[in-house]
Amino acid sequence: MEWKLFADLAEVAGSRTVRVDVDGDATVGDALDALVGAHPALESRVFGDDGELYDHINVLRNGEAAALGEATAAGDELALFPPVSGG
């Protein structure tokens, strides 16, 4: 499964794309756990002290908003977007 990372999340991980291995019945949350396991510095950027995903982090599956409990399928593209502002 491939994650696309944007803005400071890509900088922290050292790459805009990260492949993770997950079981066939994995959820988006399982894939996110695998991503954070491979890149522990991401944990404080996406999860609060309570272990919950920050409200300002957007998780997408195949270009659509995704819940962490949502099932994944082979070939899915997942993405993490931090808040983005511009001027």
Swiss-Prot record:
Keywords: Isopeptide bond, Nucleotide-binding, Phosphoprotein, Ubl conjugation pathway
Residues with PTM 1-thioglycine: G87
Pfam families reported for this sequence: ThiS
Gene3D superfamilies for this protein: 3.10.20.30
Disruption phenotype: Cells lacking this gene do not grow anaerobically with DMSO and do not show DMSO reductase activity, but their growth in the presence of oxygen and at 50 degrees Celsius is not affected. SAMP2 and SAMP3 cannot complement the samp1 mutation. tRNA thiolation is not affected.
Native organism: Haloferax volcanii (strain ATCC 29605 / DSM 3757 / JCM 8879 / NBRC 14742 / NCIMB 2012 / VKM B-1768 / DS2) (Halobacterium volcanii)
A cellular component annotation (GO) from this entry: molybdopterin adenylyltransferase complex
Gene symbol of the encoding locus: samp1
Keyword Nuclease: no
Function: Functions as a protein modifier covalently attached to lysine residues of substrate proteins, as well as a sulfur carrier in molybdenum cofactor (MoCo) biosynthesis. The protein modification process is termed sampylation and involves the formation of an isopeptide bond between the SAMP1 C-terminal glycine carboxylate and the epsilon-amino group of lysine residues on target proteins. May serve as a proteolytic signal in the cell to target proteins for degradation by proteasomes.
GO biological process: Mo-molybdopterin cofactor biosynthetic process; protein modification by small protein conjugation
Post-translational modification: The C-terminal glycine is likely acyl-adenylated (-COAMP) by UbaA, and also probably thiocarboxylated (-COSH) to function in sulfur transfer.
Keyword Phosphoprotein: yes
GO molecular function: nucleotide binding; protein tag activity
Domain of life, per lineage: Archaea
PANTHER family associated with the record: MOLYBDOPTERIN SYNTHASE SULFUR CARRIER SUBUNIT
InterPro entries listed in its UniProt record: Beta-grasp_dom_sf, MoaD_arc-typ, MOCS2A, Mopterin_synth/thiamin_S_b, SAMP1_3, ThiS/MoaD-like
Protein name: Small archaeal modifier protein 1
Modified residues (Glycyl adenylate): G87
Location in chain, cross-link Glycyl lysine isopeptide (Gly-Lys) (interchain with K-? in acceptor proteins): G87
